[in-house]
From Swiss-Prot:
Disulfide bonds: none annotated. It is found in: Nucleus. The gene is znf704. Its main location: nucleus. It comes from the Eukaryota. A zinc finger (C2H2-type) spans 281-306. A motif (CR1) lies at residues 472-476. This is Zinc finger protein 704. The CR1 and CR2 motifs mediate sequence-specific DNA binding. InterPro entries: CR1/CR2-DNA-binding_regulator, DUF4772, Znf_C2H2_type. Keywords: DNA-binding, Metal-binding, Nucleus, Transcription, Transcription regulation, Zinc, Zinc-finger. Residues 115-137 have a biased composition (Basic and acidic residues).
Length: 501
C-alpha cells in the first residue's frame, strides 16, 4: 500500500493482518493507527513505510509495508474498516505519531479498554461488510459512469468525400446556368416606346402571338391576307421572347392563353450553344413562313390558324406535324449581315416623284405647306390620316414602292406604309377595321413617326463602331507578360480606360 496511490483515501483505521507475537504462521488482525517513513534507505532514494498497528490483544506494534503485504496476501479475508477507537486508542495513535512507541514494545492498557474492542468487534465486522459493499457499489457505479460517458460522446458523422462535394458544386453550377438562360432572366422588361426605337425593329419581325402572361414571339409579317409580300430575313434577336408589362396594342385572337406557359414549362430550356446555332420551327403552309422557337407554339399556330381547330393538343390527330419543319439559324452570320448594311440618314429622305401623281388633290396644300419645314417634319403625316399598328394578318395590303431610296412614305386615304427595305420592317394600318384598329391623335402620330425615323441614325452609330478586338488594349500593347503595366480596368477584364477609341 503506497501512500502516493491513496492520496484521497487514508489508510489509517484500515484493518490488516500482521504476524503474531510468537512468530508462527497464524496471523493476527489489527487496525493501523499511524504511518511513518523509515529513513534508513535515504541514501538509495527508496523510503519504506512503517505502520503502527493496534493488535487484537490490545498491544501496539510497528510493522513494515512488506510484512503487512505478505500477511494480507495469506489471509482468508480482505477488508477495510474505519477506526472508531476510544480515547485510549487515540492516545496510542498520538504516541505512534510522535515516535513514542518503538518496535516490539507493548502499550499497557486498562482491562476495560482491552475489552471494548472485543465487545465492538461484531459491530465492526458488520460495518466492514457494509463498507466493502458500499465500496464495491461505488466502484461499479464509477465504471458505469465511465461507460456512459464514453458511449454518449457525439461521434462526428463521416465527412463527404471530395467527389461528392465536387458533384454538388457541378450541380449548383448547372442550376445557375439553366436559370441564367431562362426567358425570365434573359429578357429584361422592354417598354413599347423603347421597342420601337430598339435594335429588334431592324430584324423585320412583327409581334404575332401574345398571351395573358405577357410574352411575345416574333414572326415575319406575311400571312394569307398578304400573299405577295415575301418573308424577310431572320434576325438574331427575333427569337427571344420579350416581356411587355404595359401593352396598348390589341391581343391576338387565334392564340390561347397557354402559349406563354408552354414556352416556359412544356419544353426544356435550350442551353447556349458555342457555335451560335439555334433550332427553330418554320411553318410550311403556303404564303405563311412563320417561325417560332418551340414545337408546341408552331403546332398551335398551324392548328388554330390554318386548320381552323380550336381544340388542345390532346385531341389533335397529329396532322399539324406535316406542316412545319426544323431549321437551324446561325446567329453570327445574321449579325454579320446586319453589320454590312449601309447607314441611312433621315436628312436625305424624300418621297419618290412617282408618289406625287398618286396623291389626291386634297393633300396638295398640305404638302406645299410642309415643303418649307425641316425634312423630319416633312415626312410626318398630317392629321387627315389614321395611324394603326395592327398585326400583319389584320392589315390590308401595303403599298409597295420599288425605288432605290431606302425609305418610302406613302400616305393615302385608306392606308399607308413605312418600310425600311434593308432590313425590312413594315408598319401597316387601316381605318376600316374598328375591332382591331386604334385611333391616335396628331401628337401621337408625330411622336411615332419620329420614333420610326430616328432608328437608322442610331443603327449608323452602332455600325460605325469598331468590331470587338480591333481597338488598342493594354493586353495588346504591353502583352501578357507585362500585366503589371495594364490599367486597372484591363486587369479586371473590363473596357480599357487607357486606350480609348
Amino acid at each position: 500500500m503506497h501512500t502516493r496511490r491513496l492520496v484521497k483515501r487514508s489508510v489509517i483505521g484500515s484493518r490488516v493482518y500482521a504476524p503474531g507475537l510468537t512468530g508462527d504462521a497464524a496471523p493476527l488482525t489489527g487496525v493501523i493507527q499511524a504511518v511513518k517513513q523509515d529513513n534508513r534507505d535515504a541514501s538509495t532514494g527508496h523510503r519504506r513505510n512503517v505502520y503502527t498497528v493496534l493488535m487484537q490483544d490490545g498491544s501496539v506494534k510497528e510493522y513494515s509495508e512488506e510484512e503487512i503485504a505478505q500477511m494480507t496476501a495469506k489471509a482468508p479475508l480482505k477488508s477495510s474498516l474505519k477506526s472508531t477507537c476510544n480515547g485510549g486508542q487515540r492516545d496510542g495513535l498520538t504516541q505512534g505519531q510522535n515516535g513514542g512507541v518503538q518496535r516490539g514494545e507493548a502499550l499497557s492498557l486498562s482491562p476495560e479498554s482491552t475489552e471494548e474492542p472485543r465487545v465492538l468487534e461484531h459491530k465492526r465486522t458488520g460495518r466492514a461488510l457494509e463498507t466493502e459493499k458500499d465500496h464495491t457499489r461505488s466502484v461499479s457505479l464509477l465504471e458505469q459512469k465511465r461507460k456512459v460517458v464514453s458511449s454518449s460522446i457525439d461521434v462526428p458523422q463521416a465527412r463527404k468525400s471530395e467527389e461528392e462535394v465536387d458533384m454538388d458544386k457541378v450541380t449548383a453550377a448547372m442550376v445557375l446556368t439553366s436559370l441564367s438562360t431562362s426567358p425570365l432572366v434573359r429578357s429584361p422588361p422592354v417598354k413599347v416606346s423603347e421597342g420601337l426605337n430598339g435594335s429588334w425593329k431592324d430584324g423585320g419581325f412583327t409581334p404575332s402571338s401574345y398571351s395573358s402572361s405577357g410574352y411575345w414571339s416574333w414572326s415575319a409579317p406575311s400571312d394569307q391576307s398578304n400573299p405577295s409580300t415575301p418573308s424577310p430575313p431572320l434576325s438574331a434577336d427575333s427569337f427571344k421572347p420579350f416581356r411587355m408589362p404595359s401593352l396598348s396594342g390589341p391581343p391576338d385572337d387565334n392564340i390561347d392563353e397557354h402559349d406563354g406557359n408552354s414556352l416556359l414549362f412544356d419544353e426544356p430550356i435550350p442551353r447556349k450553344r458555342k457555335n451560335s446555332m439555334k433550332v427553330m420551327f418554320k411553318c410550311l403552309w403556303k404564303n405563311c413562313g412563320k417561325v417560332l422557337s418551340t414545337a408546341a407554339g408552331i403546332q398551335r399556330h398551324i392548328r388554330t390558324v390554318h386548320l381552323g381547330r380550336n381544340c388542345d393538343s390532346e385531341c389533335s390527330d397529329g396532322e399539324e406535324d406535316f406542316y412545319y419543319t426544323e431549321i437551324k439559324l446561325n446567329t453570327d452570320s445574321v449579325a454579320d449581315g446586319l453589320s454590312s448594311l449601309s447607314p441611312v440618314s433621315p436628312s436625305v429622305l424624300s418621297p419618290p416623284p412617282a408618289l406625287d401623281q398618286r396623291q389626291p388633290d386634297g393633300t396638295n396644300g398640305t404638302k406645299s405647306e410642309s415643303s418649307s419645314s425641316t425634312p423630319l417634319s416633312r415626312s410626318a403625316p398630317s392629321a387627315l390620316y389614321l395611324v394603326h399598328t395592327d398585326h400583319a394578318y389584320q392589315a390590308t395590303t401595303p403599298v409597295t414602292i420599288p425605288s432605290t431610296s431606302s425609305t418610302g412614305f406613302t400616305p393615302s386615304s385608306s392606308s399607308f406604309s413605312i418600310s425600311w427595305q434593308s432590313p425590312p420592317v413594315t408598319f401597316t394600318g387601316t381605318s376600316a377595321s374598328p375591332t382591331h384598329s386604334r385611333t391616335q391623335g396628331f401628337g401621337e402620330q408625330h411622336s411615332q413617326t419620329i420614333a420610326v425615323l430616328s432608328s437608322p441614325p442610331r443603327a449608323a452609330g452602332s455600325l460605325s463602331r469598331k468590331s470587338r478586338g480591333e481597338g488598342k488594349k493594354c493586353r495588346k500593347v504591353y502583352g501578357m507578360e507585362n500585366r503589371d503595366m495594364w490599367c486597372t480596368a484591363c486587369r479586371w477584364k473590363k473596357a480599357c480606360q487607357r486606350f480609348v477609341d
